[in-house]
Amino acid sequence: MSALSLLSPSAATDAAWLAAADVADVAAQLQVRYRLVGGIAITLLTHHYGISHRVPSRETADADMGVPRDVCGDERLLPALESRGYVREGGNRFVRHDGTRELTIDVLGPAPGAKLESNQEIGGLSVDLIPGLLAALLLEPVNVSLVAHLTDGTELAMTLALPDVRGALILKVFAYAGRFTDRDASDVGRLLEAAVEGGFAETDWPQTPVGREAAHLLHQFFGSTTPSLPGSSAPHSWSW
């Protein structure tokens, strides 16, 4: 487990870290498997692999809690979030206020295949099922012990389960293929830098149908003929 001590650059990051701490607390209380996914997890992976100074920084104000389908339908999940002051807004979004901060947790489930399945009724939630999340849940997590220094001087300690960088890449390349945003492209670049720094090779890539589809998308959109990623120092070509 890596130990990180990070300064928050903004109120938005304060909110994301506070929400992430709540995600970890809920998972520990219920004793369920989860991965913290999305922009905040990618940023933490760049610090875990020691490359944050080489890649673009990106702020996010929310925390995405990726969990197996049975956890989405767990009748204890909603009370656990509500006991921490969260109010449900929409099918799978939970919000609480901490002073002037608005903390947001989105609960996400794994899609069975390579396509996003929006607004799926599971238990009492209407959940987006995300392609690649199952791969991220099956791979061992990257556990980090974080001391977050918030902008008001508060120190917040937490232990977080991040996706393996390969799982994070699978998640993010599917996200890019679904919406083609510069933000997602930059995140792919950050994760590729982390994967190279971590010593991962082509033979380490998950050989599942979803893993192979993600590899195809990486080659298609981020191969040797693809322009440099927006805001990234990542090279133009990759062995994957």
Task: List each language-model region with its residue ranges.
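Compositionally biased terminal segments of proteins
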Residues: M1-W240
